[in-house]
Amino acid sequence: MKYIMFQGTSSNAGKTLTVAALCNLLSRKGYRVTPFKSQNMSLNSYTTVDNDEMSIAQVMQSEAAGIEPNCNMNPILLKPKEDFTSQVIVQGKPAGNMRFDDYQNNFRTQAIKAIEESLEYLKEDYDITVIEGAGSPAEINMYDKDLANMLIARMTDADVILVADIDQGGVFASIVGTYFLIPEEDRKRIKAVIINKFRGNADVLKPGIEKIEELTNIPVIGIIPYDETLNLPEEDSASLSTHHFSENEKITIGTLRLPRISNFTDIDPLDYEEDIGIKLVSIYDDLEDLDALIIPGTRNTVNDLVELKKSGAFDKIKKISKEIPIFGICGGYQMLSNNIIDESCSESKYGSVEGLGLLDMTTEFGQIEKVVQQSEGTIIKDSSLGFEKDTKVTGYELHEGITILGDVEPLIKIKKGQGNDESGLYDGAINGNVCGTYFHGIFHNFEFRRKFTDQLRINKGLKPLGLTKDDFKESKRVNYDQLGDLFANNVDMSFFKDLLRD
Protein backbone atom coordinates (compact mmCIF):
# COMPACT_ATOMS: atom_id res chain seq x y z
CA MET A 1 0.00 0.00 0.00
CA LYS A 2 1.25 3.46 -0.96
CA TYR A 3 0.15 6.48 1.08
CA ILE A 4 0.08 10.08 -0.19
CA MET A 5 -1.11 12.79 2.18
CA PHE A 6 -2.33 16.35 1.63
CA GLN A 7 -2.06 18.73 4.57
CA GLY A 8 -3.03 22.41 4.52
CA THR A 9 -1.63 25.67 5.77
CA SER A 10 -5.13 26.39 7.11
CA SER A 11 -8.71 25.21 7.13
CA ASN A 12 -10.49 25.58 3.78
CA ALA A 13 -7.17 25.59 1.90
CA GLY A 14 -8.56 23.09 -0.61
CA LYS A 15 -7.39 19.77 0.80
CA THR A 16 -10.74 18.06 0.24
CA LEU A 17 -10.90 18.83 -3.47
CA THR A 18 -7.18 18.18 -3.93
CA VAL A 19 -7.63 14.67 -2.55
CA ALA A 20 -10.70 14.20 -4.76
CA ALA A 21 -8.76 15.38 -7.81
CA LEU A 22 -5.87 12.97 -7.31
CA CYS A 23 -8.25 10.09 -6.54
CA ASN A 24 -10.08 10.85 -9.77
CA LEU A 25 -6.89 10.94 -11.84
CA LEU A 26 -5.41 7.77 -10.35
CA SER A 27 -8.70 5.93 -10.77
CA ARG A 28 -8.89 6.94 -14.42
CA LYS A 29 -5.39 5.52 -14.88
CA GLY A 30 -6.49 2.16 -13.50
CA TYR A 31 -5.17 2.35 -9.93
CA ARG A 32 -7.20 0.96 -7.03
CA VAL A 33 -7.32 4.15 -4.98
CA THR A 34 -9.28 5.23 -1.92
CA PRO A 35 -9.58 8.49 0.02
CA PHE A 36 -9.06 8.59 3.78
CA LYS A 37 -9.48 11.16 6.54
CA SER A 38 -8.88 9.87 10.04
CA GLN A 39 -10.94 12.52 11.82
CA ASN A 40 -13.40 14.95 10.29
CA MET A 41 -15.55 17.59 11.96
CA SER A 42 -18.63 18.23 9.86
CA LEU A 43 -22.39 18.64 9.99
CA ASN A 44 -22.76 17.15 6.52
CA SER A 45 -22.92 13.38 6.81
CA TYR A 46 -24.18 10.44 4.77
CA THR A 47 -25.50 6.93 5.37
CA THR A 48 -23.69 4.16 3.51
CA VAL A 49 -25.21 0.96 2.08
CA ASP A 50 -24.11 -0.71 5.34
CA ASN A 51 -26.14 1.88 7.30
CA ASP A 52 -23.00 3.53 8.65
CA GLU A 53 -22.57 7.28 9.02
CA MET A 54 -19.62 9.14 7.52
CA SER A 55 -18.65 12.61 6.33
CA ILE A 56 -20.07 13.81 3.02
CA ALA A 57 -16.56 14.99 2.06
CA GLN A 58 -15.17 11.46 1.94
CA VAL A 59 -18.31 10.35 0.09
CA MET A 60 -17.58 12.99 -2.54
CA GLN A 61 -13.93 11.86 -2.75
CA SER A 62 -14.99 8.23 -3.16
CA GLU A 63 -17.39 9.24 -5.94
CA ALA A 64 -14.52 11.05 -7.63
CA ALA A 65 -12.57 7.78 -7.42
CA GLY A 66 -15.54 5.82 -8.76
CA ILE A 67 -15.88 3.60 -5.68
CA GLU A 68 -18.56 2.89 -3.08
CA PRO A 69 -18.29 5.01 0.11
CA ASN A 70 -17.28 3.09 3.23
CA CYS A 71 -17.15 4.39 6.80
CA ASN A 72 -13.53 3.22 7.13
CA MET A 73 -12.59 6.09 4.80
CA ASN A 74 -13.59 8.36 7.72
CA PRO A 75 -13.29 6.36 10.96
CA ILE A 76 -13.89 9.34 13.28
CA LEU A 77 -16.63 11.88 12.55
CA LEU A 78 -17.26 14.72 14.99
CA LYS A 79 -20.65 16.42 14.66
CA PRO A 80 -20.66 19.68 16.66
CA LYS A 81 -23.60 20.23 18.97
CA GLU A 82 -23.61 22.84 21.75
CA ASP A 83 -21.21 24.16 24.41
CA PHE A 84 -18.00 22.65 22.97
CA THR A 85 -19.73 19.27 22.71
CA SER A 86 -19.77 16.98 19.67
CA GLN A 87 -21.46 13.73 18.83
CA VAL A 88 -18.65 11.27 18.16
CA ILE A 89 -19.20 8.75 15.36
CA VAL A 90 -16.69 5.88 15.33
CA GLN A 91 -16.53 3.67 12.24
CA GLY A 92 -20.06 4.67 11.33
CA LYS A 93 -21.71 4.22 14.73
CA PRO A 94 -22.47 6.77 17.49
CA ALA A 95 -20.11 6.56 20.47
CA GLY A 96 -21.83 9.30 22.48
CA ASN A 97 -21.64 13.04 23.03
CA MET A 98 -18.33 14.34 24.36
CA ARG A 99 -16.89 17.66 25.38
CA PHE A 100 -13.75 18.67 23.50
CA ASP A 101 -11.39 18.25 26.47
CA ASP A 102 -12.91 14.88 27.40
CA TYR A 103 -12.53 13.63 23.83
CA GLN A 104 -8.91 14.78 23.59
CA ASN A 105 -7.82 13.49 26.98
CA ASN A 106 -9.90 10.36 27.54
CA PHE A 107 -10.93 9.04 24.13
CA ARG A 108 -7.64 9.36 22.28
CA THR A 109 -6.56 5.72 22.73
CA GLN A 110 -9.87 4.38 21.38
CA ALA A 111 -9.74 6.84 18.48
CA ILE A 112 -6.23 5.76 17.45
CA LYS A 113 -7.27 2.10 17.63
CA ALA A 114 -10.22 2.78 15.31
CA ILE A 115 -8.01 4.70 12.87
CA GLU A 116 -5.48 1.86 12.74
CA GLU A 117 -8.25 -0.70 12.19
CA SER A 118 -9.75 1.31 9.34
CA LEU A 119 -6.40 1.75 7.61
CA GLU A 120 -5.85 -2.00 7.86
CA TYR A 121 -9.34 -2.66 6.46
CA LEU A 122 -8.71 -0.49 3.39
CA LYS A 123 -5.50 -2.38 2.58
CA GLU A 124 -7.56 -5.37 1.47
CA ASP A 125 -9.16 -3.60 -1.51
CA TYR A 126 -6.86 -0.74 -2.50
CA ASP A 127 -3.27 -0.14 -3.60
CA ILE A 128 -3.10 3.62 -2.94
CA THR A 129 -4.62 5.66 -0.13
CA VAL A 130 -4.82 9.43 -0.59
CA ILE A 131 -5.10 10.97 2.86
CA GLU A 132 -6.57 14.33 3.80
CA GLY A 133 -5.31 16.13 6.88
CA ALA A 134 -7.41 18.47 9.02
CA GLY A 135 -6.96 22.19 9.55
CA SER A 136 -3.24 22.91 9.80
CA PRO A 137 -0.46 20.56 10.94
CA ALA A 138 1.25 23.47 12.72
CA GLU A 139 -1.22 23.91 15.59
CA ILE A 140 1.60 23.94 18.13
CA ASN A 141 -0.74 24.54 21.07
CA MET A 142 -2.12 21.00 20.68
CA TYR A 143 0.47 19.24 18.54
CA ASP A 144 0.68 16.30 20.93
CA LYS A 145 -3.10 15.78 20.65
CA ASP A 146 -3.00 15.44 16.85
CA LEU A 147 -5.23 12.76 15.34
CA ALA A 148 -5.39 13.89 11.74
CA ASN A 149 -2.09 15.28 10.47
CA MET A 150 1.48 14.24 11.24
CA LEU A 151 0.39 11.42 13.54
CA ILE A 152 -1.29 9.81 10.52
CA ALA A 153 1.69 10.58 8.30
CA ARG A 154 3.93 8.75 10.78
CA MET A 155 1.43 5.91 11.17
CA THR A 156 1.35 5.29 7.40
CA ASP A 157 4.84 6.55 6.49
CA ALA A 158 3.10 8.89 4.05
CA ASP A 159 4.71 11.49 1.82
CA VAL A 160 3.11 14.87 2.58
CA ILE A 161 2.18 17.63 0.13
CA LEU A 162 1.35 20.99 1.69
CA VAL A 163 -1.63 22.84 0.18
CA ALA A 164 -1.66 26.63 0.58
CA ASP A 165 -4.62 28.93 -0.11
CA ILE A 166 -3.48 32.08 -1.93
CA ASP A 167 -7.03 33.43 -2.12
CA GLN A 168 -6.88 34.28 1.59
CA GLY A 169 -3.70 36.35 1.16
CA GLY A 170 -0.33 35.88 2.88
CA VAL A 171 0.39 32.62 1.11
CA PHE A 172 4.18 32.77 1.37
CA ALA A 173 4.13 33.55 5.09
CA SER A 174 1.66 30.71 5.66
CA ILE A 175 3.88 28.22 3.81
CA VAL A 176 7.08 29.20 5.61
CA GLY A 177 5.34 29.58 8.97
CA THR A 178 3.69 26.18 8.72
CA TYR A 179 6.89 24.50 7.59
CA PHE A 180 9.12 25.86 10.35
CA LEU A 181 6.58 25.43 13.16
CA ILE A 182 6.47 21.70 12.49
CA PRO A 183 9.14 19.73 14.42
CA GLU A 184 12.07 18.72 12.24
CA GLU A 185 11.31 15.00 12.51
CA ASP A 186 7.90 15.53 10.89
CA ARG A 187 9.04 18.37 8.64
CA LYS A 188 11.13 15.88 6.67
CA ARG A 189 7.93 14.21 5.48
CA ILE A 190 6.87 17.30 3.52
CA LYS A 191 7.94 16.63 -0.04
CA ALA A 192 6.22 19.44 -1.99
CA VAL A 193 3.93 22.47 -1.92
CA ILE A 194 0.86 23.28 -4.04
CA ILE A 195 -0.49 26.82 -4.20
CA ASN A 196 -4.26 26.71 -4.57
CA LYS A 197 -7.07 29.06 -5.69
CA PHE A 198 -4.89 31.46 -7.70
CA ARG A 199 -6.44 34.21 -9.82
CA GLY A 200 -4.38 36.04 -12.42
CA ASN A 201 -0.97 35.66 -14.06
CA ALA A 202 1.11 33.02 -12.27
CA ASP A 203 4.36 34.68 -13.40
CA VAL A 204 3.98 37.27 -10.63
CA LEU A 205 4.52 34.49 -8.09
CA LYS A 206 7.93 33.41 -9.40
CA PRO A 207 10.11 35.56 -7.08
CA GLY A 208 8.13 34.40 -4.05
CA ILE A 209 8.25 30.78 -5.10
CA GLU A 210 12.01 30.93 -5.62
CA LYS A 211 12.43 32.33 -2.10
CA ILE A 212 10.14 29.69 -0.60
CA GLU A 213 12.08 26.90 -2.29
CA GLU A 214 15.36 28.44 -1.10
CA LEU A 215 14.18 28.69 2.53
CA THR A 216 12.57 25.26 2.76
CA ASN A 217 14.37 23.24 0.10
CA ILE A 218 10.90 22.01 -0.90
CA PRO A 219 9.63 22.38 -4.50
CA VAL A 220 6.40 24.17 -5.37
CA ILE A 221 4.98 21.65 -7.84
CA GLY A 222 1.81 23.42 -8.86
CA ILE A 223 -0.31 26.56 -8.95
CA ILE A 224 -3.97 25.60 -9.25
CA PRO A 225 -6.27 28.36 -10.55
CA TYR A 226 -9.55 29.24 -8.89
CA ASP A 227 -12.32 27.62 -10.93
CA GLU A 228 -15.80 28.95 -10.19
CA THR A 229 -17.37 26.67 -12.80
CA LEU A 230 -16.85 23.57 -10.65
CA ASN A 231 -20.05 22.54 -8.91
CA LEU A 232 -19.30 20.03 -6.18
CA PRO A 233 -20.77 19.34 -2.70
CA GLU A 234 -19.68 21.65 0.11
CA GLU A 235 -18.32 20.12 3.30
CA ASP A 236 -19.47 22.66 5.87
CA SER A 237 -21.43 25.86 6.34
CA ALA A 238 -18.27 27.99 6.12
CA SER A 239 -17.83 26.81 2.54
CA LEU A 240 -21.54 27.27 1.92
CA SER A 241 -21.18 31.04 2.27
CA THR A 242 -18.90 31.14 -0.79
CA HIS A 243 -20.81 28.58 -2.86
CA HIS A 244 -22.18 29.98 -6.11
CA PHE A 245 -25.79 28.95 -6.56
CA SER A 246 -27.77 29.94 -9.63
CA GLU A 247 -29.82 33.03 -8.79
CA ASN A 248 -31.90 35.52 -10.75
CA GLU A 249 -33.75 32.74 -12.56
CA LYS A 250 -37.46 32.69 -13.42
CA ILE A 251 -38.27 30.64 -10.31
CA THR A 252 -36.69 31.21 -6.90
CA ILE A 253 -36.52 28.44 -4.31
CA GLY A 254 -35.47 29.79 -0.94
CA THR A 255 -33.42 27.60 1.40
CA LEU A 256 -33.61 28.72 5.01
CA ARG A 257 -30.12 29.06 6.44
CA LEU A 258 -30.80 27.78 9.92
CA PRO A 259 -28.20 28.66 12.58
CA ARG A 260 -27.35 24.96 12.94
CA ILE A 261 -27.97 23.90 9.34
CA SER A 262 -26.80 20.43 8.35
CA ASN A 263 -26.87 18.20 5.27
CA PHE A 264 -27.40 21.20 3.01
CA THR A 265 -26.21 19.09 0.07
CA ASP A 266 -29.86 17.99 -0.08
CA ILE A 267 -30.56 21.08 -2.20
CA ASP A 268 -27.70 20.61 -4.69
CA PRO A 269 -29.75 18.84 -7.42
CA LEU A 270 -32.23 21.73 -7.56
CA ASP A 271 -29.40 24.01 -8.68
CA TYR A 272 -29.19 22.05 -11.95
CA GLU A 273 -32.84 22.56 -12.84
CA GLU A 274 -33.53 24.89 -15.75
CA ASP A 275 -35.38 28.10 -14.75
CA ILE A 276 -34.65 27.42 -11.05
CA GLY A 277 -32.59 29.75 -8.85
CA ILE A 278 -31.51 28.85 -5.31
CA LYS A 279 -31.48 31.63 -2.74
CA LEU A 280 -30.02 31.08 0.73
CA VAL A 281 -32.16 33.13 3.09
CA SER A 282 -31.24 34.10 6.63
CA ILE A 283 -33.77 33.73 9.42
CA TYR A 284 -33.71 37.53 9.59
CA ASP A 285 -34.45 38.03 5.88
CA ASP A 286 -37.72 39.02 4.31
CA LEU A 287 -39.21 35.82 2.86
CA GLU A 288 -41.23 37.54 0.18
CA ASP A 289 -40.70 36.97 -3.56
CA LEU A 290 -40.00 33.26 -3.14
CA ASP A 291 -41.75 30.59 -5.19
CA ALA A 292 -41.04 27.84 -2.65
CA LEU A 293 -39.19 27.50 0.66
CA ILE A 294 -37.11 24.56 1.84
CA ILE A 295 -36.43 24.17 5.56
CA PRO A 296 -33.37 21.89 5.62
CA GLY A 297 -31.85 19.65 8.25
CA THR A 298 -30.44 20.99 11.49
CA ARG A 299 -28.22 19.53 14.16
CA ASN A 300 -30.68 20.80 16.80
CA THR A 301 -34.35 21.13 15.91
CA VAL A 302 -35.51 22.69 19.18
CA ASN A 303 -32.80 25.34 19.44
CA ASP A 304 -33.30 26.41 15.84
CA LEU A 305 -37.07 26.63 16.37
CA VAL A 306 -36.42 28.96 19.28
CA GLU A 307 -34.19 31.06 17.02
CA LEU A 308 -36.96 31.19 14.39
CA LYS A 309 -39.31 32.65 16.98
CA LYS A 310 -36.78 35.20 18.21
CA SER A 311 -35.96 36.37 14.68
CA GLY A 312 -39.54 36.66 13.48
CA ALA A 313 -39.05 33.98 10.80
CA PHE A 314 -41.51 31.71 12.63
CA ASP A 315 -44.46 33.97 11.83
CA LYS A 316 -43.16 34.80 8.34
CA ILE A 317 -43.05 31.10 7.42
CA LYS A 318 -46.59 30.55 8.67
CA LYS A 319 -47.77 33.50 6.60
CA ILE A 320 -46.17 32.48 3.30
CA SER A 321 -47.29 28.84 3.72
CA LYS A 322 -50.71 29.96 2.50
CA GLU A 323 -49.15 31.17 -0.76
CA ILE A 324 -46.17 28.98 -1.70
CA PRO A 325 -44.94 25.39 -1.12
CA ILE A 326 -43.04 24.76 2.12
CA PHE A 327 -40.85 21.64 2.14
CA GLY A 328 -39.13 20.39 5.30
CA ILE A 329 -36.32 17.82 5.37
CA CYS A 330 -35.43 15.90 8.56
CA GLY A 331 -35.12 18.58 11.29
CA GLY A 332 -36.94 20.98 8.99
CA TYR A 333 -39.73 18.40 8.71
CA GLN A 334 -39.91 18.10 12.50
CA MET A 335 -40.31 21.88 12.79
CA LEU A 336 -43.57 21.66 10.81
CA SER A 337 -45.16 19.78 13.75
CA ASN A 338 -47.74 21.24 16.12
CA ASN A 339 -45.48 20.45 19.05
CA ILE A 340 -42.06 18.98 19.71
CA ILE A 341 -42.02 16.93 22.91
CA ASP A 342 -38.64 16.64 24.61
CA GLU A 343 -39.40 15.93 28.26
CA SER A 344 -35.89 14.67 28.98
CA CYS A 345 -34.31 17.77 27.36
CA SER A 346 -32.24 15.50 25.12
CA GLU A 347 -32.26 18.16 22.37
CA SER A 348 -31.84 21.31 24.46
CA LYS A 349 -32.51 23.02 27.76
CA TYR A 350 -35.87 24.25 26.47
CA GLY A 351 -37.55 20.85 26.61
CA SER A 352 -40.88 20.76 24.77
CA VAL A 353 -41.72 23.63 22.42
CA GLU A 354 -44.40 24.75 20.01
CA GLY A 355 -43.77 23.88 16.36
CA LEU A 356 -44.81 25.78 13.26
CA GLY A 357 -48.08 23.85 13.24
CA LEU A 358 -48.20 23.60 9.46
CA LEU A 359 -48.79 19.84 9.56
CA ASP A 360 -51.06 18.14 12.09
CA MET A 361 -48.46 15.97 13.79
CA THR A 362 -46.29 15.73 16.91
CA THR A 363 -42.57 14.98 17.10
CA GLU A 364 -41.19 13.27 20.20
CA PHE A 365 -37.55 12.94 21.26
CA GLY A 366 -36.11 10.39 23.66
CA GLN A 367 -38.20 7.48 22.35
CA ILE A 368 -35.66 5.73 20.12
CA GLU A 369 -31.96 5.58 19.38
CA LYS A 370 -30.64 7.60 16.46
CA VAL A 371 -31.79 6.25 13.10
CA VAL A 372 -28.96 5.78 10.58
CA GLN A 373 -29.87 3.93 7.40
CA GLN A 374 -30.53 4.07 3.70
CA SER A 375 -34.21 4.09 2.84
CA GLU A 376 -36.57 3.68 -0.07
CA GLY A 377 -40.27 3.77 -0.81
CA THR A 378 -43.00 5.10 -3.10
CA ILE A 379 -45.14 8.24 -3.12
CA ILE A 380 -48.58 7.35 -1.78
CA LYS A 381 -50.82 9.64 -3.83
CA ASP A 382 -50.91 12.45 -6.37
CA SER A 383 -50.64 15.93 -4.88
CA SER A 384 -50.99 19.58 -5.83
CA LEU A 385 -47.20 19.89 -5.36
CA GLY A 386 -46.71 17.76 -8.48
CA PHE A 387 -45.80 14.47 -6.82
CA GLU A 388 -47.36 11.42 -8.48
CA LYS A 389 -48.55 8.18 -6.94
CA ASP A 390 -46.13 5.21 -7.08
CA THR A 391 -43.08 7.38 -7.89
CA LYS A 392 -40.07 5.55 -6.43
CA VAL A 393 -37.80 7.49 -4.07
CA THR A 394 -34.61 6.63 -2.22
CA GLY A 395 -32.66 8.54 0.41
CA TYR A 396 -30.98 8.12 3.75
CA GLU A 397 -32.12 8.77 7.31
CA LEU A 398 -30.05 10.43 10.03
CA HIS A 399 -32.37 11.48 12.82
CA GLU A 400 -33.44 11.19 16.41
CA GLY A 401 -37.09 11.39 17.39
CA ILE A 402 -40.33 10.01 15.98
CA THR A 403 -43.20 11.85 14.33
CA ILE A 404 -46.80 10.88 15.06
CA LEU A 405 -49.29 11.96 12.40
CA GLY A 406 -52.71 13.39 13.23
CA ASP A 407 -55.20 14.46 10.59
CA VAL A 408 -52.64 14.55 7.79
CA GLU A 409 -51.61 12.15 5.02
CA PRO A 410 -48.17 10.45 4.97
CA LEU A 411 -46.01 11.16 1.92
CA ILE A 412 -44.14 7.89 1.37
CA LYS A 413 -44.97 4.22 1.81
CA ILE A 414 -41.73 2.69 3.03
CA LYS A 415 -40.13 -0.36 1.48
CA LYS A 416 -36.87 -0.03 3.44
CA GLY A 417 -36.13 2.27 6.36
CA GLN A 418 -37.91 3.60 9.44
CA GLY A 419 -39.49 6.92 8.49
CA ASN A 420 -41.91 8.49 10.95
CA ASP A 421 -41.77 5.84 13.69
CA GLU A 422 -40.66 2.34 14.65
CA SER A 423 -43.41 0.71 12.58
CA GLY A 424 -41.42 1.48 9.43
CA LEU A 425 -44.62 1.82 7.42
CA TYR A 426 -44.70 5.46 6.36
CA ASP A 427 -42.51 8.51 6.09
CA GLY A 428 -43.24 12.19 5.86
CA ALA A 429 -46.50 14.08 5.64
CA ILE A 430 -48.29 16.34 3.18
CA ASN A 431 -51.20 18.74 3.36
CA GLY A 432 -51.84 21.23 0.58
CA ASN A 433 -48.81 23.49 0.14
CA VAL A 434 -46.86 21.96 3.03
CA CYS A 435 -44.82 18.78 2.88
CA GLY A 436 -41.92 17.11 4.67
CA THR A 437 -39.84 13.95 4.92
CA TYR A 438 -37.07 12.33 6.94
CA PHE A 439 -35.38 11.28 3.67
CA HIS A 440 -32.14 13.16 3.10
CA GLY A 441 -31.35 13.16 -0.60
CA ILE A 442 -35.02 13.27 -1.59
CA PHE A 443 -34.31 15.76 -4.39
CA HIS A 444 -31.58 13.50 -5.76
CA ASN A 445 -34.47 11.43 -7.15
CA PHE A 446 -34.86 12.83 -10.65
CA GLU A 447 -38.53 11.99 -11.26
CA PHE A 448 -39.59 13.29 -7.84
CA ARG A 449 -37.54 16.47 -8.26
CA ARG A 450 -38.71 17.13 -11.81
CA LYS A 451 -42.39 16.67 -10.91
CA PHE A 452 -41.95 19.19 -8.09
CA THR A 453 -40.10 21.76 -10.19
CA ASP A 454 -42.47 21.29 -13.12
CA GLN A 455 -45.36 22.19 -10.83
CA LEU A 456 -43.46 25.35 -9.85
CA ARG A 457 -43.05 26.11 -13.56
CA ILE A 458 -46.76 25.65 -14.14
CA ASN A 459 -47.52 27.90 -11.15
CA LYS A 460 -45.43 30.63 -12.84
CA GLY A 461 -47.04 30.16 -16.25
CA LEU A 462 -44.00 28.37 -17.68
CA LYS A 463 -43.92 25.22 -19.76
CA PRO A 464 -43.06 22.04 -17.79
CA LEU A 465 -39.92 20.22 -18.94
CA GLY A 466 -41.11 16.67 -18.40
CA LEU A 467 -38.80 13.72 -17.76
CA THR A 468 -35.88 14.60 -20.03
CA LYS A 469 -32.31 13.91 -18.91
CA ASP A 470 -31.03 14.22 -15.35
CA ASP A 471 -28.52 17.08 -15.65
CA PHE A 472 -27.46 16.67 -12.01
CA LYS A 473 -26.49 13.02 -12.35
CA GLU A 474 -24.66 13.60 -15.63
CA SER A 475 -22.84 16.66 -14.34
CA LYS A 476 -21.37 14.94 -11.28
CA ARG A 477 -19.02 12.77 -13.32
CA VAL A 478 -18.25 15.68 -15.64
CA ASN A 479 -17.37 17.84 -12.64
CA TYR A 480 -15.18 15.16 -11.05
CA ASP A 481 -13.29 14.69 -14.32
CA GLN A 482 -13.03 18.47 -14.74
CA LEU A 483 -11.56 18.67 -11.24
CA GLY A 484 -9.05 15.94 -12.06
CA ASP A 485 -8.09 17.64 -15.32
CA LEU A 486 -7.66 20.99 -13.55
CA PHE A 487 -5.21 19.32 -11.17
CA ALA A 488 -3.34 17.45 -13.92
CA ASN A 489 -2.97 20.55 -16.10
CA ASN A 490 -1.54 22.73 -13.34
CA VAL A 491 0.55 20.37 -11.23
CA ASP A 492 3.80 18.57 -12.08
CA MET A 493 2.41 15.04 -12.41
CA SER A 494 5.89 13.55 -12.81
CA PHE A 495 6.30 14.24 -9.08
CA PHE A 496 3.49 11.79 -8.30
CA LYS A 497 4.81 9.25 -10.79
CA ASP A 498 8.10 9.29 -8.90
CA LEU A 499 6.31 8.92 -5.55
CA LEU A 500 4.41 5.89 -6.78
CA ARG A 501 7.61 4.29 -8.10
CA ASP A 502 9.41 4.61 -4.76
Swiss-Prot record:
Function: Catalyzes amidations at positions B, D, E, and G on adenosylcobyrinic A,C-diamide. NH(2) groups are provided by glutamine, and one molecule of ATP is hydrogenolyzed for each amidation.
Record family assignment: Belongs to the CobB/CobQ family. CobQ subfamily.
GO BP: cobalamin biosynthetic process
UniProt key word Disulfide bond: no
Gene Ontology molecular function terms on file: ABC-type vitamin B12 transporter activity; catalytic activity
Source organism, top-level taxon: Archaea
Pathway the protein contributes to: Cofactor biosynthesis; adenosylcobalamin biosynthesis
Recorded name of the encoding gene: cobQ
All copies of domain GATase cobBQ-type, residue ranges: 250-448
Keywords, sorted A to Z: Cobalamin biosynthesis, Glutamine amidotransferase
NCBIfam families attached to this UniProt entry: cobQ (TIGR00313), PRK00784.1 (NF001989)
Record has rRNA-binding as a keyword: no
SUPFAM superfamilies: Class I glutamine amidotransferase-like, P-loop containing nucleoside triphosphate hydrolases
Protein name from the UniProt record: Probable cobyric acid synthase
Catalytic residues in the record: 330 (nucleophile), 440
Source taxonomy: Archaea, Methanobacteriati, Methanobacteriota, Methanomada group, Methanobacteria
